[in-house]
């Protein structure tokens, strides 16, 4: 019975992530894609990486196949160059695999975000270096598009790093199955956290040259990791 429950859970998770990958890819390329073909926000790689962290090898292989096909279909539907479709797919797959490998090393066999320190390590040692490396590869592989290689590198890194910082921790937090009781946060800590989120939200939309709304992402993820449901 335990095996069948695990199989059902993994299958359902894989299906949800595949559909979410396709939906988020459509959202990102339809609403945030620039003329050079690179979206300014890219959530799908983080979803795929989370699946690689949470699923066993066989289910992860099916997830990779489903997400690759979904991503290529979305890019084809919005008119991306045919020769760029496998390049986009390969880069996304490589990025997700590398990020998942590092996250597994960081989180250990329990594969969960235990605290803010773990979240920070994931950002510094998994998300940032992985998306930076993939951005360089994207600049080399997609330099024939409308943008120059440096523009593609910068655009890819900012879009994928921000997107993965949103989607990867979110899935890991949602899928977290803690053992034992979750410590209850004090009322003072809850007030401080909510107050900081409100303050950052207010600052984010003041006139600035820096895109301060990006500050909301780490603030909300950090708050979620501290105030997760019991």
Please give the residue ranges for each predicted region.
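Short aromatic-rich membrane-water interface segments that cap or initiate transmembrane helices
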Residues: 150-163
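Short helix-perturbing small/polar motifs within transmembrane alpha-helices
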Residues: 2-40, 44-147, 167-230
